[in-house]
């Protein structure tokens, strides 16, 4: 197995995608190359526990820890989706000691596009 190269990056981009069932967090360098990622499912949560804010915070903590080991100090956050773990993920990055330069909301909003799915009974 090849040995992993040590990566040093001073700033980067973090994408947080919150669906109704899962939260995916990925970190990349300014060029867009993904450095690390985590989701509620990869952190060991299964089923209905994946959608909780707690699981989103755990996934964000793992990415924040990995990114700090790479030397990243400042990040831009891009948040997408309507899931419940969005705020918890943002707070996790702030509490980890990373300097957040900007937070962008990238949630797609339809201008009377497709019909939304039916509400669960």
Curated annotation (Swiss-Prot):
Segments passing through the bilayer: none
Pfam families xref list: Ribosomal_S11 (PF00411)
GO BP field: translation
Keywords attached to this entry: Ribonucleoprotein, Ribosomal protein, RNA-binding, rRNA-binding
Keyword field contains Ribosomal protein: yes
Record-linked InterPro entries: Ribosomal_uS11, Ribosomal_uS11_bac-type, Ribosomal_uS11_CS, Ribosomal_uS11_sf
Family annotation (NCBIfam families): PRK05309.1, uS11_bact
Protein name from the UniProt record: Small ribosomal subunit protein uS11
Organism from which the protein derives: Mycoplasma pneumoniae (strain ATCC 29342 / M129 / Subtype 1)
Gene: rpsK
């Amino acid at each position: 197995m090849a040995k992993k190269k040590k990566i040093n990056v001073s700033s980067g981009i973090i994408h947080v995608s919150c669906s109704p069932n899962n939260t995916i967090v990925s970190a990349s360098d300014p060029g867009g190359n993904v450095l690390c990622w985590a989701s509620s499912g990869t952190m060991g949560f299964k089923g209905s526990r994946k959608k909780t804010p707690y699981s989103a915070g755990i996934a964000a903590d793992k990415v924040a820890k990995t990114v700090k080991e790479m030397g990243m100090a400042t990040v831009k956050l891009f948040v997408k989706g309507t899931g419940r773990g969005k705020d918890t993920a943002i707070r996790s990055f702030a509490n980890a000691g990373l300097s957040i330069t900007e937070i962008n909301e990238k949630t797609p909003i339809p201008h009377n596009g497709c019909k939304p799915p039916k509400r669960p009974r």
